Regions:
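Substrate-binding pocket helix/loop in short-chain dehydrogenase/reductase
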Residues: 92-94, 98-106, 201
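Active-site loop-to-helix junction immediately N-terminal to the catalytic Tyr of the SDR YXXXK motif
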Residues: 97, 142-151, 162, 190
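Canonical Rossmann dinucleotide-binding motif of NAD(H)/NADP(H)-dependent dehydrogenases/reductases
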Residues: 2-33
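Active-site helix of classical SDR
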Residues: 117, 152, 160
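Residue(s) in the substrate-gating loop at a strand-loop-helix junction
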Residues: 137
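C-terminal substrate-recognition "lid" of short-chain dehydrogenase/reductases
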Residues: 114-117, 209-238, 243-244
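Alpha-helical segment proximal to the catalytic Tyr-Lys
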Residues: 122, 165-169, 229
Length: 262
């Protein structure tokens, strides 16, 4: 897939999944704008890939509107938006989760995604073309002890469908990717601190492994590309088979690899 001549904006683009998307789009010819709350990190990545950096807190609607206007004025109309900005949540019992914790997750993961999609997507719709890929999560598809994060990501999936319907005849496609347990720096830190058990995460997936940021980026690029020109409003899980494997635990778990059977 070539993205030569395309302008791509990545929110939360300086680390994790966002950084993988930024690098991969740049490698395939796109002019990439790395936006992030951490401007220094965004500038370092932009310098590495030959892109542009911009400070952006997606939780503020006006900041997204200003970023969309500034990028268009400096570089031209945006062709691709990837909304990867997000914050995580520790698994806590509902009564231990503070109102401030919930508000921050909702502000960034749900409202922030909405702010960016509308700020850039409305301009795409007026121009008659564009592709948006939102980053949701399998946490928005199943019950988990993530009482703020899971509902916020479920909302991202549904807003993706709503925007796809509204902008479809204006030439704008909107799709979601739902990552499974992805070996980002944040998850790697949690594993190193003993907060997550990598064996449990791997064994819960049909493929027996975790997902990489590059796995997610490949799916994002496909949905953003012309190869997906007839695809809009979908949610694509990229989870190494976690969703399909969960119910097998009630039947004794997944079978071993065929090569290990007698």
């Amino acid at each position: 897939m070539s993205f030569t001549g395309r302008i791509a904006v990545i929110t939360g683009g300086a680390s994790g999944i966002g950084a993988a998307c930024s690098r991969m789009l740049a490698e395939r010819g796109a002019r990439v704008v790395v936006t992030d709350r951490d401007l220094a990190r965004a500038e370092a990545l932009a310098q590495e890939i030959g892109g542009t950096a911009l400070a952006l807190d997606v939780g503020h609607r006006a900041a997204n509107d200003e970023a969309a206007a500034e990028i268009e004025a400096r570089l031209g109309p945006v062709d691709i938006l990837v909304t990867s900005a997000g914050v995580l949540q520790r698994p806590l019992r509902a009564e231990l989760l503070s109102e401030a914790d919930v508000e921050e997750v909702v502000r960034i993961d749900q409202i922030g995604t909405w702010n960016s999609a509308v700020a850039f997507g409305a301009r795409m719709a007026r121009r008659g073309q564009g592709s948006i890929v939102t980053i949701a999560s399998i946490a928005g598809m199943r019950s988990m002890p993530l009482h703020a994060y899971s509902p916020a990501k479920a909302a991202v999936i549904e807003m993706t469908r709503c925007l796809a319907a509204e902008w479809g005849r204006s030439g704008v496609r909107v799709n979601a990717v739902s990552p499974g347990f992805t070996l980002t720096p944040a998850l790697a830190s949690a594993i190193a601190a003993g907060e997550r058990d990598p064996g449990l995460l791997e064994n819960a997936a049909a493929q027996g492994r975790m997902v990489t940021p590059e796995d997610i980026a490949e799916a994002v690029l496909f949905l953003a590309s012309d190869a997906a020109r007839s695809i809009t409003g979908i949610n694509l899980p990229v989870d190494a088979g976690w969703l399909v494997a969960g119910s097998w635990a009630t039947y004794g778990g997944l079978p071993p690899a065929r090569g290990n059977l007698p």
